[in-house]
A protein has these predicted regions:
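Mobile-element integrase/transposase regions
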Residues: 56-133, 158-162, 166-167, 172-174, ...
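Acidic/histidine-rich, metal-coordinating catalytic segments
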Residues: 170-187, 205, 209, 259-264
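C-terminal domain-tail junction helix/linker
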Residues: 14, 195-199, 221-293
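RNase H-like polynucleotidyl transferase catalytic core
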Residues: 76-81, 177-181, 195-214, 230-235
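Mobile genetic element proteins and their domesticated derivatives, centered on retroelements
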Residues: 6, 28, 43, 62, ...
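Generic alpha-helical secondary structure signal
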Residues: 1-5, 23, 189, 196, ...
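A short acidic/small-residue loop/turn micro-motif
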Residues: 136, 147-154
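Basic, flexible linker segments flanking DNA-binding modules
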Residues: 3-104, 208, 264-273
Length: 293
């Protein structure tokens, strides 16, 4: 190989590397418009699924490109509690603590979180609206949601009815609805909708957030990833942002708990789903089941 050919090869390699790097940056920014807080690993998995070998980038190189261009995410956490379990309404036992779902529409989980809305007239400069989410425990698909100005049970009921509309026609299998013991979920109206649709209520038995960890986790994903860095000045803005976020989450975001499928894909499956993280809870449930035989 001549010196000229050698340098030409290096120039071509460098040009190609820079071109792919810019391609990755544009891709990451495009996805982040829909999911502002999505992490590097999930971004890389979406990238790998969408593009051919010609644009292939390894995970470590992908992370390095994000880092070099200031596209890493700084995490924000923590929301105040929206649960008031100090009431005299009937509550129900935890029916899911020893169950690993093996099909869609076996267990639904629900929780409520808050989202800030800027308000110059408010004492603190902002007010809150509230988001109810109902998610399938097997597929991780968000089936129902509602953005509301208050914590009244009527708003959570609308999220529940949205989820119920997704059930297949003639559905008759056992379905459990699991939540905390908040007044919304314990209200007579909410329980009646469950009963009218042959859905069995299940509730946490203590104030331990781990008892409803799955629902609290999806709320964190919506707030700290899908809506990351966004500010809102109206309830309508929050509604539109959540609507787009839920659509992206269900149809495009791969999930480590469902073998890197999207929730929409997993909702069409059955059988035990491979996790890409270790679940001590599931280990304990399986061990208990074996000892009972």
């Amino acid at each position: 190989m001549t010196r000229q050919a050698f340098y030409k090869r290096d120039e071509d390699f460098l040009f190609r590397r820079l071109a792919i790097e810019q391609f990755v940056v544009q891709f990451a920014r495009g996805v982040r418009e829909q999911d502002p807080g999505i992490g590097a690993d999930n971004l890389w998995r979406i990238y790998r699924e969408r593009f051919s070998e010609e644009y292939r980038v390894g995970r470590d190189a992908f992370r390095d490109i994000l880092h070099e261009h200031g596209l890493n995410i700084r995490r924000r956490f923590r929301a105040p509690r929206t649960t008031d379990s100090r009431h005299s309404l009937p509550t129900y036992p935890n029916l899911v603590k020893n169950v690993i779902p093996t099909r869609p529409n076996q267990i639904w989980v629900s929780d409520i979180t808050y989202i800030a809305i800027e308000d110059s007239e408010a004492r603190l400069g902002y007010t809150f609206c509230f988001l109810t989410i109902i998610m399938d425990a097997y597929s991780k698909k968000i089936l129902g949601w509602r953005v509301a100005p208050t914590l009244e049970a009527a708003h959570s009921i609308k999220a529940l009815k949205m989820a119920i509309k997704t059930l297949p026609e003639g559905f008759s299998e056992t379905l459990i609805h699991h939540s905390d013991r908040g007044t919304q979920y314990a209200s007579a109206d909410y329980i009646k909708v469950l009963a009218d649709n042959n859905i069995t209520p299940s509730m946490t038995e203590s104030g331990n957030p781990k008892d409803n960890a799955m629902a609290e986790r999806i709320n964190s994903t919506v707030k700290n990833e899908l809506l990351y860095g966004k500010t809102f000045s109206s309830l309508r803005q929050v509604f539109e942002a959540v609507r787009k976020a839920v659509g992206f989450y269900n149809s495009e975001r791969p999930h480590s708990s469902i073998d890197w499928h999207t929730p929409d894909e997993a909702h069409q499956m059955q059988g035990e789903m491979k996790r890409h993280w270790h679940s001590w809870r599931e280990d304990a449930i399986k061990k208990q089941a074996m000892e009972a035989v």
